UniProtKB/Swiss-Prot annotation:
InterPro entries: DRBM-containing_protein, dsRBD_dom, STAU2_DSRM_2, Staufen_C. This is Double-stranded RNA-binding protein Staufen homolog. Strongly expressed in nervous tissue (at protein level). Its main location: other. SUPFAM superfamilies: dsRNA-binding domain-like. Residues 344-411, 435-546, 578-645, 690-758 form the DRBM domain. RNA-binding protein which is required for syntaxin location in sensory neurons during long-term synaptic facilitation. Binds to syntaxin mRNA and is required to maintain its accumulation at the axon hillock following neuronal stimulation and at the opposite pole in stable unstimulated sensory neurons. It comes from Aplysia californica. Pfam families: dsrm, Staufen_C.
Length: 950
């Protein structure tokens, strides 16, 4: 306390002399006080408030505190040394200066000494702290001036030594401070990095928790939805079984119903886990355990959950596979024909016909409608029963007929196939419907390696075996029992004792299959040959799934040789070979050369007919078909019959393969075209088809040349053309006309069909382009909109009109004039005679007014003319408006206006004459009559202009 009090007094006295020097001392003291307070009790409070998120800066503050404490100790040591020297030499006195000097005297270390008459204030400054000597003022004020002067000199010398020591320490201090600063900076960076990592972890924790929670929620919802879908599917299957009682009766009477679980619905797989854990089905709700990595979750549905569920035991319970999850809607599955899980009606009909040993055939009866939207009619003959249906395509019509036959047929349905229980069922893949062999074939195809199966016949054990040994080499199967002769029933006298033997059941036969995939070989065994194949395929899948797929690499020569050897070792029955292969084999045995050649190709590009010739030695056969493959096959069939007539060979080139059970050859899928050619020639077939297509079908059915269409001529204006097309079939020709080539071709085809005897008319297109004279432009009657104009100047005599034929229309651009020879040939109906044109030139005289010329022209052309005049009063005068209407069917109006009535009529008549002159210019030479001379029209037009200007 005394030391602190003394330091405070020194600071107050020094602040009066040099406030700037005291600032550094006060700052150091503040730090010293804070460090002292931390040492006493403040450190515990600081340490207690530390957290992993707060920087630990206590090391920095401690370092600065130690540095300041060392400086304070050095200063205190100097003061103590000064007191000791003073005690040892008490004669030392301080210097006394006169009061008249005033001001301050600078010392060596840069400080100033302030002097007065009564007291001397001395202040000394050091580099890192100021040491004040103010506390000596009261002690030295009473001493003599000489002693004071000597003491000041001695103290000045000591202060110089202290400054030298401090300068040396100051030179060493920056290096130490730089090293300590680097260490502190490194520690601070490490602490900041730790804090950032910790904050990032704290931020990621809630996100990961939320993501995991969402995944669990989605998985739970998915499992709930799947369990509901499976319950609905089970109810739907049970309802289907109730609707079809006949298969149930068959299942009840089948001998394998108890073993094969035939009560399971079609399309489901029986899992062995359901047989072992059948007591789990008595639970009230299904237990769902989520399984990751693509494995299917085990689900057990209880029959008690649904009120309509049948009461079945644990052995009859069915495990629904995961593949049926997508088929929640049964109706959509029946409609989609491409679904592989459900059999199509045609497939079921095939099974039904095979079960009842009867034949079935589809026949295309008729097709109607336009080419882009046809309707096909198909008839199914199933034994003695016939069913008909229609559809947008042939395939849809076939399926519709098959569906009707399945419902209405009286033939017994085949029983559903029982589920197989073998060793392969215990290790099924994730997809219950895909067998290991199918999965292996797909994998081998990706790798480009063939999967070849070969049966291995196990060696039969000998009929004898070693004594006291069974077939497995065990000794405890039989033993000798020696008993007395009186008690032993086997004792037969003469000391012979027969041994007792145990009779064991016969061991089940095991099947072995060798599977070779590329250069790898796998051996599979099982109770059946199919089970052995599945076992070998599973072993191959375990290894091949872990290997990388090598796509694009070619097989090595060794692998190719091995595959060729295996292919040669396989026995292939002749019934499974094609006729072409059999022809080549027989020719090879007899050292003959086989040659196939396409000699003729006829028909349009979309429906060609090929004729192929087969030559073997001196034998030649020909086959015809709609494709090269079909024609080649037919030629090979005929050649095969010829080759079988040859005498057998004495020594065959190679032994024939073992004969197997003859199997019925697979019928051609395209049964629908067996009688199509004869049906197309029927007049009742294809009534609604386009006449052009119908005519082509008839010619193809009769194997005649297709019709040839030729454009004869075209006439009329560019926008009102008329085309005439002629069709030629053998020696018959028929023309047809229409506003475009397509309709003219259709009309010609219809005329040819009528000529050939196909009298049923085909329906006209909905939007016909034919223009009937009694109708408007769009084929609609004018009705009430038709207006008849009666002209007083027109003669209106019907005998003088030029009438066209019943099927002809007036060609625009030609001026039809009344003529006495109107009943001439049809070729001259659309042309004007020379006399008529001369009269037309005499009518267009330049001396006549336009109104008179128009009246004369309309009278000559037998055209109705109507003139209407209107008067309108204006401020400038009276204005006359004239409207001239020409024609009755398609009237045309022309207007004119002027101050006088004659001028307005002439103006409207001039416009009407221009239209008629323009029509006359469109007449083309070349069979349509002479052309109006241009000079006559020019003179007529100039005369009308002059008259109008007058």
């Amino acid at each position: 306390m005394s030391h602190n009090h003394m330091m405070n007094n020194q600071q107050q006295h020094a602040a009066m002399i040099n406030p700037g020097a005291v600032a550094s001392v006060s700052g150091a003291q503040v730090q010293q006080r804070s460090m002292m307070s931390q040492q006493r009790g403040g450190s515990h409070a600081i340490n207690s408030s530390k957290s992993p998120y707060q920087l630990q800066t206590s090391s920095i503050s401690q370092f600065s505190h130690l540095q300041q404490q060392q400086q304070q100790q050095q200063q205190q040591q100097l003061v103590n040394n000064y007191h000791k020297q003073k005690q040892m030499s008490p004669d030392i006195t301080s210097h006394q200066f006169s009061s008249s000097t005033g001001g301050g005297m600078p010392t060596q270390n840069g400080n100033y000494q302030s002097m007065s008459g009564s007291s001397i204030h001395t202040s000394m400054g050091l580099d890192n702290g100021q040491l004040s000597l103010q506390h000596q003022h009261h002690q030295y004020s009473s001493q003599p001036a000489q002693a004071l002067q000597t003491s000041v000199q001695q103290h000045h010398y000591q202060s110089q030594q202290m400054t030298q020591q401090q300068q040396q320490a100051a030179q060493q201090q920056p290096q130490q401070q730089y090293q300590s600063f680097q260490q502190q900076h490194h520690l601070i960076q490490q602490q900041q990095q730790q804090q950032q990592i910790h904050t990032q972890q704290q931020q990621q924790l809630p996100q990961q928790a939320m993501h995991q929670q969402q995944q669990h929620l989605q998985l739970h919802q998915h499992l709930q939805q799947r369990s509901l879908n499976q319950q609905q599917q089970q109810q739907q299957r049970y309802q289907k079984q109730q609707q079809q009682p006949q298969p149930k009766q068959i299942l009840q009477h089948s001998p394998t119903s108890g073993k094969s679980l035939s009560s399971a619905p079609h399309g489901t797989s029986v899992q062995p886990s359901t047989l072992l854990n059948h007591h789990q089905h008595n639970m009230a709700a299904p237990q769902v355990t989520p399984v990751t990595n693509g494995e299917s979750a085990g689900e057990d549905t209880s029959p008690k959950d649904s009120p309509q569920a049948p009461k079945t035991s644990g052995r009859d319970s069915v495990h629904v596979s995961d593949n049926e999850e997508s088929a929640s809607n049964a109706s959509e599955m029946q409609q989609s024909l491409a679904n592989t899980k459900e059999k199509t009606p045609m497939c079921l009909i095939n099974e039904l016909a095979r079960f009842n040993k009867m034949s079935h055939q589809y026949t295309l009866v008729d097709e109607q409608g336009p080419a882009h939207k046809k309707t096909f009619y198909v008839k199914l003959k199933l034994g003695d029963e016939e069913y008909s249906a229609s559809g947008e395509s042939i395939k849809k019509a076939q399926h519709a007929a098959a569906a009707i036959a399945l419902v209405e047929t009286k033939c017994p349905h085949p029983p559903p196939k029982p589920a197989r229980l073998g060793c392969c069922d215990l290790e099924k893949s994730a997809d219950g419907n895909i067998t290991p062999t199918v999965e292996l074939n797909a994998l081998a195809m990706k790798r480009g390696e063939p999967a070849l199966y070969k049966s291995i016949e196990p060696q039969q054990p000998p009929y004898y075996h070693q004594p006291n040994m069974d077939f497995r080499g065990l000794y405890n199967q039989r033993y000798h029992q020696y008993m007395r002769a009186s008690r032993d029933p086997r004792y037969r006298g003469n000391g012979v004792l027969w041994p007792l033997r145990y009779h064991y059941p016969r061991m089940n036969r095991a099947f072995y299959v060798s599977l070779r995939v590329g250069h790898r070989e796998f051996i599979g065994d099982g109770p059946t040959r199919q089970a052995a194949r599945h076992n070998a395929a599973q072993k191959a899948l375990r290894i091949l799934k872990n290997l990388p797929v090598q796509s694009g690499e070619k097989k090595s020569e060794e692998q190719a040789d091995e595959a060729a050897e295996d292919a040669c070792e396989e026995d292939v029955d002749d019934s499974l070979k094609s006729e072409i292969s059999l022809v080549h084999e027989i020719a090879l045995r007899r050292n003959m050369v086989v040659q196939f050649e396409v000699i003729r190709e006829t028909g349009p590009p979309h429906m060609k007919n090929f004729l192929t010739r087969c030559t073997v030695a001196d034998m030649v056969t020909e086959g015809e078909g709609n494709s090269k493959k079909t024609s080649k096959k037919k030629a090979a069939e005929l050649m095969l019959e010829e080759l079988r007539k040859l005498p057998p060979l004495a020594t065959p080139a190679f032994p024939r393969p073992k004969s197997k059970i003859q199997m019925n050859k697979k019928k051609n899928r395209n049964l629908i075209k067996s009688e199509l050619q004869q049906q197309k020639a029927d007049p009742n077939y294809g009534v609604g088809i386009n006449p052009i297509s119908r005519l082509i079908q008839i010619m193809q059915a009769q194997k005649k040349k297709e019709p040839v269409y030729t454009l004869v001529t075209e006439r009329g204006l560019p926008r009102r053309r008329e085309f005439i097309v002629q069709v030629e079939v053998e020696d018959k020709t028929c023309p047809g006309s229409g506003p475009n080539k397509k309709l003219a071709k259709r009309a010609a085809a219809e005329a040819m069909l009528q000529l050939l005897g196909y009298t049923k008319p085909s329906p006209q297109p909905t939007k016909s382009s034919f223009k009937n004279p009694s109708t408007g432009e769009a084929g609609q009657t004018n009705g009430d909109k038709k207006v008849t104009f009666v002209g007083g100047d027109s003669p209106g005599d019907g005998d003088d009109k030029v009438s066209s034929g019943s099927n002809q229309q007036r060609v625009p651009g030609l001026l039809h004039l009344p003529s006495k020879s109107s009943a001439s040939s049809s070729g001259n109906q659309h042309t004007a005679s020379k006399e008529s044109l001369v009269n037309l030139a005499s009518i267009l005289k330049p001396n006549l007014r336009p109104e008179i010329q128009l009246r004369e022209l309309c009278k000559a052309m037998d055209c109705q003319l109507e003139i209407d005049d209107f008067t309108k009063k204006r401020t400038s005068g009276t204005e006359h408006i004239t409207r001239i209407t020409i024609g009755s069917e398609n009237p045309q109006s022309f207007h004119g206006s002027n101050t006088s009535l004659e001028s307005s009529r002439d103006m409207a008549a001039l416009d009407a004459l221009k239209v008629l002159v323009a029509r006359a210019k469109d007449i083309h030479p070349g069979g349509d009559g002479p052309q109006v001379k241009k000079d006559v029209l020019a003179r007529s037009g100039s005369g009308m202009k002059k008259d109008f200007s007058k």
